[in-house]
Amino acid sequence: MRVTDFSFDLPDELIARYPMAQRNASRLLTLDGNTGTLVDKQFTDLLGMINPGDLMVFNNTRVIPARLFGQKASGGKLEILVERMLDDKRILAHVRSSKSPKVDSIIHLDGGYEMKMMARHDALFELQLLSELSILEVLEAVGHMPLPPYIDRPDEDADKERYQTVYNQNPGAVAAPTAGLHFDDAMLEALKAKGVNIAFVTLHVGAGTFQPVRVDNVLEHKMHSEWANVPQDVVDLIARTKAAGNRVVAVGTTSVRSLESAARASAGQLNAFSGDTDIFIYPGYQFQVVDAMVTNFHLPESTLIMLVSAFAGYEHVMAAYQHAIKQKYRFFSYGDAMFVTKKAH
């Protein structure tokens, strides 16, 4: 398959630059992966589509304020975007400046903090914080929310809350698992009251999620790697759910990738998993764990639209996107959602 097979023209006004006033006020497009049937709904209608005994799996990563501003010793301005925290003093990061910082040079951050450039790893820089504080403390003090490049505005105070799920737990993501942004506490409680089981995995979404696919042939794409954790209690819950004939519903592509990574690591048997994953899901992939998913509308030619196409069928997904554009759904991180059921192979 060609990367251009996943292209579509999106009018600029359909890119959501701000979230809805209420988390669950978005629209929801449902797609039946077997028939291709589309239905326009509201996000709150999701409650009626998840059955008692179904298991919903959420990604509880917490977005860190991963964008830092500062200057080199020479005075040149630079911008740092954390890709991942290596430990409590060191990060791997993208650095934007007129000239790349040299090894052993000092970077002066806003707020008076300093970092030392330790090494370069391809496009990423290894930086060490020179402070008694931890990286996380410095990010919380002077970091900015790393809004995606297509939200072309400076971050605002409101983004600290809204570019974050209500159930976030483990700091480390530099992009939000956006399908989860639609859920508020009341909706989670309503799902539980209905007899829906809820479980959490962690995948620290990296900045690589916004990197364009730079090859023509899908098979040649080298996927970035991210850290994921699928605990044993979630594995046990999935086994019980499947044994009872109920569905596993993943909230977001990151939850899908976490669960499928765990299955891949143990040759189709689902075992607990903790470590880096570079799983790349595109049409032809056989899903081992997930039966249905909640997901936002993704960028053209992205690995995420490829994943959804693998799940519900390429023609069905591309037709759904054309429908969404026609019906003026809001796209990307702060946009509307889809509820998609898996196409039988």
From Swiss-Prot:
**Entry's Gene Ontology BP terms:** queuosine biosynthetic process; tRNA wobble guanine modification
Pfam families attached here? Queuosine_synth
First-level EC class: transferase
Just give the chief location class.
Answer: cytoplasm
Annotated Gene Ontology cellular components are: cytoplasm
Its annotated pathway?
A: tRNA modification; tRNA-queuosine biosynthesis
Alphabetically ordered keywords of this record: Cytoplasm, Queuosine biosynthesis, S-adenosyl-L-methionine, Transferase
Subcellular compartments: Cytoplasm
Molecular function (GO) terms for this protein are: S-adenosylmethionine:tRNA ribosyltransferase-isomerase activity
Q: Which HAMAP family match?
A: QueA
The record's PANTHER family line, in alphabetical order, gives: S-ADENOSYLMETHIONINE:TRNA RIBOSYLTRANSFERASE-ISOMERASE
Q: Which family does it belong to?
A: Belongs to the QueA family.
What does this gene product do? Transfers and isomerizes the ribose moiety from AdoMet to the 7-aminomethyl group of 7-deazaguanine (preQ1-tRNA) to give epoxyqueuosine (oQ-tRNA).
The cross-references to NCBIfam families, in alphabetical order and at most eight, read:
PRK00147.1, queA
Q: How does it assemble?
A: Monomer.
Record-given protein name: S-adenosylmethionine:tRNA ribosyltransferase-isomerase
